[in-house]
Amino acid sequence: MSGDGSCSYSAEEGIRELLQSAKAKFRESVDVAIKLSVADSKSGESIRGAVVLPKGLGREVRVAVFAKGEHAKQASSAGADVVGDEELIEEIKKGRRLDVDWCIATPDFMPQISAIAKILGPRGLMPNPKFGTVTLELAKMVGIIKSGQVKFKSDRYGIVHVKIGDIGFTPEDLLENFNAVVAAVQGLRPTTIKGSYVRGVFVNSTMGRSFRIAGIG
């Protein structure tokens, strides 16, 4: 979150300034950083959730599904990139790396998936009922994720980092994604916080400076 904190911009202005200042010779990512009045190391609270970016991520979102029988067929038909059962779990145990962004599982697979939790967990891939990724509605969930759903979690400093696109996006599309992320994070405000919840919001590109966004509390 480096940048000149003395200047603040509206979300629209900040995004336009960011795009104009991006000079790298590659397609830089655009990220939002939201500083919250929670810090895992002190309060034990963290903010975690998921949000569908209205304009997507600008790339394919890949999904793996653990299911069998008719549920596996539904997942495949819905566009899941990897579909497997116990055999897939065994392959992962032996070192197969899943090149995916999300994993979904039917509830009956969770006891078996626990055996690879130490593999999936650090990559943020463990199916979780809070994200709707432990479900029998596989086709629906695959569709939601493929449409551009992203996960987020506050770090130990109370900061949520989310990619909202890249410099190839229009300002309008980035603004839509930005607003969706901010609304999702604001909607998860803990009841234990009595004062200010959002302390600062910044947008930045991979190699560029950050721009502080005003008017978000």
Swiss-Prot record:
One of its GO terms (cellular component) is large ribosomal subunit. It comes from Anaplasma marginale (strain Florida). HAMAP family: Ribosomal_uL1_B. Transmembrane segments: none annotated. Keywords: Repressor, Ribonucleoprotein, Ribosomal protein, RNA-binding, rRNA-binding, Translation regulation, tRNA-binding. The keyword Ribosomal protein applies. This is Large ribosomal subunit protein uL1. Binds directly to 23S rRNA. The L1 stalk is quite mobile in the ribosome, and is involved in E site tRNA release. One of its GO terms (molecular function) is structural constituent of ribosome. It holds the Pfam family Ribosomal_L1. InterPro entries: Ribosom_uL1_bac-type (IPR005878), Ribosomal_uL1 (IPR002143), Ribosomal_uL1-like (IPR023674), Ribosomal_uL1/biogenesis (IPR028364), Ribosomal_uL1_3-a/b-sand (IPR016095), Ribosomal_uL1_CS (IPR023673). One of its GO terms (biological process) is regulation of translation. Belongs to the universal ribosomal protein uL1 family. PROSITE patterns: RIBOSOMAL_L1 (PS01199). Part of the 50S ribosomal subunit. The keyword Ribonucleoprotein applies. It comes from the Bacteria.
